[in-house]
Amino acid sequence: MRVAIIYPPFDFEGKIPLLSQNRVFIYTHSERIKIYPLVMASAATLLKANGHDVLYLDGINERLSREEFDNQLNDFSPELVLLETKVPVIRKHWEYIKEEKIKDPERQYVLAGDHVSFFPTESMENSPVDFVITGGDYDVSLSKLVDYLEGKGNIPKGVYFRDGSNSGKFELTPDLDTLHYIDRELTKWHIYGEAYLQRPCAYILTGRGCRGPKGVGVCRFCIWQFAFWNCSARLRSPANVVNEIKLLVENYGVKEIFDDNEAGSIWNKDWLIEFYQQMKKQDLIGKVIISSNARADCLLDKEVCKILKETGFRMLKIGLESGNDASLRRLGKATKVEEIVKGVKNAKDYGLRVMVTIMVGYPWESEREVNKTYQVAKELLLYKTHCGDSLEANIISSYPGTPLFNDALRHNWFDIDPYDYEKYGLAKPILKSPIDAEKWCNTIWKLHLHPVFILKSLLSARNIHDIKLLFRGANSLLGHIKDYIK
């Protein structure tokens, strides 16, 4: 079968949609953010490995015009098309499918993503989509669906059909080692990257799902844990991950790997020890840099920080979310501010760079409380600052289906119609708040302009890679500051 894996291009008032591999969607002015869609890339890989003809076409991150995109898609002439969707753009995707179905009624369309995993029948009612795949392992489900449509195998679980039927609750793949390594050439790996990563960079998933010292992640704002992973966490084996890293280094000259799993693999100390041993065995330590998402409470154990540094980790992306314990409790974060501060400082003590992520605009936080978040963010940013440290700030969003969405409905927190989906992606508050959330986002981003941060970042630059990193970061910062200017 001829299958296309696509992201149709569109923008909003000149801003770029951050759709691929993104837990929180916004439109941004920053052109430096091109996140590699790992599950979509895996879907393309599995289909090709099973003998299907595959077109991978990311019109957003390739910065294609609609005409260029349509020409490439029509030249390929797919029989089946997969789109990843998300709540702020789902109406655009419904309209896209309607338009394309008029042109070619025989071409079949599949929607996957976090929103349709919660609300699969909604897309059937609002568009002529042929199939909706639910759950996070939609790469595996799509491969099985295509085989089924060709008369091979059984219907995968979690698929909704045009006739109103479905195949039941989705299932997750128990052993992620059984999946193929992503075909990087098919999926144009080289076009992706972010300002804070050294070049050439590549993305991987060491697993799927979040976990910390106190159990699986259940943050009430996190749509992926609830829509995709059933509040579970799975890891590939260390040997399997190291073999993929070796391929990326030897075949593509990759200098930095980013693990975009929700909390990386850092919550499992035994896994990290074996990972270090495998990296050493394959003679990869010192030949590639690794960065990762992480939870700060996993870094309270200084031995974990030591292992990370010795293995070649450079930067950790860590969620602070708020500088107030009451907010962390409401969010289900299962940690305290003092633990986050200690974990971040432990990492920096071992020479690891840290990106701290923050959210503002909670309905229950006052100016005093958001100022406390600002002060904690400032403290962490300026603590042992080195080239590569940074932070990011966003306005809290509560996507339909998440526990926070249900909280907002129950407490009348919404400042918009909660079903006015497009407003979830405009970098503006959707929840009532006693503070000016846009102003505070802008203020927190501008901590990068603090003279101490600038001086320490410049003085700690050691090579051309660091200089390029600083340049890209400054360029990206201007876009982010612009996002939150009224």
Tell where the protein language model's regions lie, with residue ranges.
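Flexible glycine/acidic-rich beta-alpha junction loops that bind and position SAM and/or redox cofactors
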Residues: 13-15, 120, 267, 326, ...
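Short glycine-rich His-centered loop
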Residues: 3-32
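Radical SAM [4Fe-4S] cluster-binding motif and immediate context
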Residues: 181-354, 362, 375
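Radical SAM enzyme core and accessory elements
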Residues: 2-5, 70, 79, 150, ...
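Catalytic cores of alpha/beta
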Residues: 122-125, 304, 364-379
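Glycine-rich beta-alpha loop elements in corrinoid/cobalamin-binding modules
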Residues: 39, 46-50, 55-172, 397, ...
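Residue-level recognition of beta-strand->loop/alpha-helix junctions
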Residues: 57-60, 84, 223, 319, ...
